[in-house]
Amino acid sequence: MIKTGNPIISIYTEMTPNPETMKFVVNKLLYPNKSIDFPDAASTTPSPLAAELFTFPFIRGVFICSNFVTLTKTNDTDWADVIPTIKQFLKEYLEDNRAVINEEEIVTTPVFSGDESDVVQRIKELLENYVKPAVEMDGGAIQFKDYHEGVVTVMLQGSCSGCPSSMITLKAGIEGMMKRMIPEVKEVVAEAE
């Protein structure tokens, strides 16, 4: 039966550098200009969509950003076996216009607890303008957490969390760029979730 009045949702998948994650791109904005990570089922209170995705026994992480959902699967699951099921679920869920994120349920925590200095502003701008777009293309996100005595702490989310190549990207790519562009930066480290 054809539904009328609701948009037709199309979904395609993109592989990420992390073999355990897959990016499901949708022709609809899910969480415009924002991202939110659900590393486990207990953290899904703000997202009915994430909560339902965790009912699949092979899902171990959900990340929602702009127009895509990045899912992390269990090691014993083959993507080829579950992609059609996930795509069908997402299509039906979104065509029914069900809630993706309930903003009022999000508990915000301060991202930075130190002085907002010129160095911190430059770090945030570099992350926002250079790093974040590249990381999002791979189905992940990076969030600034802290800066203290030359050490920048970031949180890796989505496909970046647990990715075998994330430490290479962090050290060779992000840390190298920050050291060149912001001389005060001595090291970039990732905070575990």
Predicted regions span which residues?
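Domain-level signature for proteins that mediate thiol-based redox and metal-cofactor handling
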Residues: M1-E193
